From Swiss-Prot:
Subunit structure, as described in the record: Homodimer. Interacts with dpn (via bHLH motif). Interacts with da (via bHLH motif). Interacts with Bap60.
Compositional bias ranges of the Basic and acidic residues kind: 108-121
Protein name, UniProt field: Protein sisterless A
Location relative to the cell: Nucleus
């Protein structure tokens, strides 16, 4: 048998991360049952849907781990706003003591202000966390997209190299075109 001299770069699931690695052996009950019985279209569809669900869940876990790690590495800092000027506090004290209602209303106003300030601080902190999480998720998805694009380009190069070698060995070009049409590669060039 003639040996092929295709240059195959490291095409493995390890380069893409273990997220995309298919099940090996009989670790998946769905695979072992599907392979032991005859392959019916319903079983294949169920197996594909289970595999897609597994991949989606694993991808979501990877994304969440990445976001959590980035939040740990880049803690969110919320600066405290400057306290209000003393003139405002003095004017409020003068109005509050001039009304003659006692010190109860002044402390109620200060408590309400303190609670509002604390609520605003929490809200600003939560908003900053949400923005950071979105930024890190976007960074993760962009990185995954770049990896996928690199893998796709590599596969295109391997296919083009294989086609060139087949043509050099005398394989009919019409058959290659038919194969391209069958596998949906006619739009790639």
């Amino acid at each position: 048998m003639e040996r092929s001299h295709l240059y195959l770069p490291t095409l493995s699931y390890a380069a893409m991360g273990h997220v995309y690695a298919p099940y090996r052996g009989s670790s998946s009950p769905a695979l072992s049952t599907a392979s032991s019985t005859s392959s019916k279209p319903e079983q294949i569809e169920e197996l594909v849907s289970q595999q897609l669900h597994h991949l989606k869940m694993h991808y979501a876990d990877e994304e969440q781990r990445y976001v959590d790690q980035m939040l740990l590495e880049n803690p969110i800092v919320v600066e405290r706003r400057a306290p209000p000027p003393l003139k405002t506090e003095l004017a409020m004290d003068c109005r509050g003591s001039g009304s003659g209602s006692g010190s109860g209303s002044g402390s109620d106003v200060k408590d309400a202000q303190r609670q509002r300030a604390e609520s605003c601080r929490k809200s600003r902190y939560n908003n900053k966390i949400k923005k950071a999480k979105l930024r890190f998720r976007h960074k993760f998805v962009s990185g995954q997209l770049k990896k996928s694009a690199v893998m796709l380009d590599t596969m295109r190069d391997v296919i083009a190299q294989a086609e060139r070698q087949l043509l050099e060995r005398g394989y009919p070009a019409a058959t290659l075109e038919r194969m391209r049409a069958t596998f949906g590669l006619e739009m790639e060039q």
